[in-house]
UniProtKB/Swiss-Prot annotation:
Modified how: The full-length protein can be released from cells and is able to signal via the IL1RL1/ST2 receptor. However, proteolytic processing by CELA1, CSTG/cathepsin G and ELANE/neutrophil elastase produces C-terminal peptides that are more active than the unprocessed full-length protein. May also be proteolytically processed by calpains. Proteolytic cleavage mediated by apoptotic caspases including CASP3 and CASP7 results in IL33 inactivation.
Lineage, broadest ranks: Eukaryota, Metazoa, Chordata, Craniata, Vertebrata
Residue ranges of the propeptide: 1-94
GO terms under cellular component: chromosome; extracellular space; nucleoplasm; transport vesicle
One protein family per Pfam: IL33_bt
Keyword annotations from UniProtKB, A to Z: Chromosome, Cytokine, Cytoplasm, Cytoplasmic vesicle, Nucleus, Secreted, Transcription
Protein name: Interleukin-33
Note on domains (UniProt): The homeodomain-like HTH domain mediates nuclear localization and heterochromatin association.
């Protein structure tokens, strides 16, 4: 007679079995799950002229959670991985002692212009220290630049100013971003930019393709009486000025007062 064999069987309910299987499956498929959350830090920097710079540094906080195993007694281990995102700088308000100029709304990310990206753009009218308007006229399929008095009902021409960070330290004069002075390009109409002709000491409108030549860039200086001046990037000490009712390049000696009236301009939204 064969001995009887005894078997010990633990009964598991159907509901409990399904629950256990579900947990095991989830653990197997999601052993290492990652969740990314974006975090941003915003701070503001007010320059001497009132130019308000908004700095926004964003990064992703990626949280990796390892599912517990039976051996670890369901202990959780977490670690944070910080992935830095590209820092964005935008000029939130532009005020060289004036109420501000109209903000050109579209954001720019065109890195093809001389290898740098513009910070922002503004559309403004350009006038002299004596409130004469800078106008642009199409004559014989080319543009001419004039400095003249306008009638009250005449509409002022607008110029699109694109702002860039220059390599010149902002400690010299004027305003800057991240320790560097600002420089601008000026475009009164599409595909045309003000261009410094250093040989002829003149300011001309050139139809250009990107990348723009260095002659199209001017270092921006903040001046008294709500004025600014534009210094040639390619020829330090030479500024855009007014001569015989036209724009011209004027050399200003460093020992002289850079506040001379013929190189001072005003920017306005009207």
């Amino acid at each position: 007679m064969k001995p009887k064999m005894k078997y010990s069987t633990n009964k598991i309910s159907t509901a409990k079995w399904k629950n256990t299987a579900s947990k095991a499956l989830c653990f197997k498929l999601g052993k290492s799950q990652q969740k990314a959350k974006e975090a941003c830090h915003v701070y503001f920097m007010k320059l001497r002229s009132g130019l308000m710079i908004k700095k926004e540094a964003c990064y992703f906080r990626r949280e990796t959670t390892k599912r517990p195993s039976l051996k670890t007694d369901r202990k959780h281990k977490r670690h944070l991985v910080l992935a830095a995102c590209q820092q964005q700088s935008t000029v939130e308000s532009f005020a060289f002692g004036i109420s501000g100029v109209q903000k050109y709304t579209r954001a720019l990310h065109d890195s093809s212009i001389t290898g740098i990206s513009p910070i922002t753009e503004y559309l403004a009218s350009l006038s002299t220290y004596n409130d004469q308007s800078v106008t642009f006229a199409l004559e014989d399929e080319s543009y001419e630049i004039y400095v003249e008095d306008l009638k009250k009902d005449e509409k002022k021409d607008k110029v699109l100013l694109s702002y860039y960070e220059s390599q010149r330290p902002s400690s010299e004069s004027g305003d800057g971003v991240d320790g560097k002075m600002l420089m601008v390009t000026l475009s009164p109409t599409k595909d045309f930019w003000l261009h410094a002709n250093n040989k002829e000491h003149s300011v001309e409108l050139h139809k250009c393709e990107k990348p723009l030549a260095d002659q199209a860039f001017f270092v921006l200086h903040n001046r008294p009486s709500n004025c600014v001046s534009f210094e040639c990037k390619t020829d330090p000490g030479v500024f855009i000025g007014v001569k015989d009712n036209h724009l011209a390049l004027i050399e200003v000696d460093s020992s002289e007062n850079l506040g001379t009236e013929n190189i001072l301009f005003k920017l306005s939204e009207t």
